Amino acid sequence: SWDLLWASLFAGLMFLVAHASYMVLSAHHKHSETETDALEAAHKHLPELIERHTFMARAFHWVMAASMFVLLLTAFLPIVGVKFAWVKWHWMAGLVLTGSIIYHIIHATFFMDFWSIWVGPKDIPEFKTEMMRDFGQDVPGAPKPGKYPLGNRLYHLAVMVFGLIVIGTGITMMYRVRTGIVERNPYIMADPAWGLTYVGHGLMGVGFVGLVIAHIYFALRPEKLWITKAMIFGTISRRDYLMHHDPSRWAVEGSKKSNVG
């Protein structure tokens, strides 16, 4: 609804302002350059550019991003008064999103390190380190993440939950319209079930507005641009790899053990 859309936009923008203000005014402690220099000297055998995302992984990301923008625009532009035949574009983008997610599940399961993106108790030391750095404390020798920082993994978890709900409800809602793919049958569920389906779909859509705002914000932050560039060009520098990652948790080509993905 209009109220929920504005609430999501307001919450997202307030988060951006609060976080940006915090990063400017706080004593947020950065990684030690001296420590990184020592690591780089000890890992000269690694290539200068290290692959972070394969072409197929990047293609999935941008296809998903494009379909997500189409879904959000076709969902909320009519609410603000922009009239067009949005239903067809909406369910078509939904099918593209669904297809990209299915591809990603297969690709991540059989061709990548499946467990590297998940969050668990093992990540508590890393979380504590990030909190200490946020309060300006130097944490020499602190644990570093593997391929994906904790923030990325938490965001992935949120997108997964929201995405599965929005896809499940969206496919069900296709039975309410004429798509030419499934036969229209609004009687497959009772009215209360349809109501819950629409509410769930709408809430997840509004939630995605906030998630997309946060994603774009962090992608454009100066200290995160190295991650954003990797999603465009596929590689990161050896220095960024050693500064932000633990080679024992994400081994790359040229190290003693390699990790697929």
Ranges and model annotations:
Residues S1-G261:
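Membrane-embedded alpha-helical bundles that constitute the cytochrome b-like, heme-associated redox core
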